[in-house]
Amino acid sequence: MAKRNFVSTYSLLWVLVIAFITGAVFSCTDNSEAEKRLTSAEALMNQHPDSALAILQGIDRSSLSSGNGKARYALLMSQALDKNYIDTTTFDILQPAIDYYIDKGTPDEKLTTFYYQGRIYQNKGDEDNAMLSFINAREIT
């Protein structure tokens, strides 16, 4: 009888471990659909910015849980708006990219973030800060 209880306890423990591991894996990849959409939008950005914008507008931003995911969305959305001639004059959209990429981004991410920061300053008519952003971008290269 003791052996039988041991086996059932062991089986229950094994099921719980598998359930925990499965939950951990899925919680880490819970935004994989959003990440796929970001990748699709990025691939379309230069040739079909209107399609990239449509994809980005269809992403539920609350599904982006990581700082990198939020920053990537912010930068891609800023690019899509600019490439579709939609001028923005606030940093509401780009700010997550500025906050994340300036410290943690690759050189390309930093450069692109500074460039779109400069574009927003240009749209606001603030040529001095636009030039500073472009100079910061230039210094990264």
Report each predicted region and the residues it spans.
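A "functional boundary" signal
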Residues: 2-10, 14-141
